[in-house]
Amino acid sequence: MGRFRRYRTAWSRHHRSGGFGIHSPFAFNFVQNVLGERYPYYAYARIAKWRATAKAALGGCWPHSSLISLNEARMLFRITNFFNPSQLLVIGARSGVSAASVKAVSSQSVLHLYSPHYAQSRVQQQLLMPFGDQVRHYTDISECVQAYFSQISGDAEPFVLVNEIGDEMELDALKSAILPIVRKQGVIVLRNLHKHELAARLWAECKHHAQYGQTYTNGKTGILIANPKLQLEHFSLWLK
């Protein structure tokens, strides 16, 4: 969704985000009590501290818009908290704030992180090293994906967060991993749809292959919940 279209649809997205016109009980609850939740969670103070640390460490190295907003980091935490996965797959660490935010949900969860520049990123290390071996680092995306799915038990739903996609090779690897989830069951969160063409293309592929479940997006972040119990619906929202 381009900037002009986001502005043009702002009122309708804001209206829908209040629950108006949403008939699915699951979707209404998810929009109102997860995406739109305004009461603070226990991890919010830690998330704010991580973001402040990343901002200070990065200094003028990155444009301000490249650092995840505090609201989005909190939303990622709430989404993860709602589904409470025991195994998480995160593609791209950026500053490390998003990865730390989803890992903060459970001290028992294991996060499989594909971040080819982790060894050179002091801020990623600063934020993620305190989690110890509960964050497993990979510099090869295929190895990361394979290791993640080998740890998923038969009845567990995959949970995937994609922060960025570096090139066509990574896109192909993610298609092979993610599209089967879309056709079965699991949760996929894609960020930076408005900034990165490859992320937008993967999001379009996910929506195209979805036969059931629900998608939620504001044109910047997309959330796909693949669940055969849910009728296929697409919601354009004003996400916090």
Residue map of PLM features:
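A short alpha-helical cap/connector motif
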Residues: 1-159, 165-184, 193-240
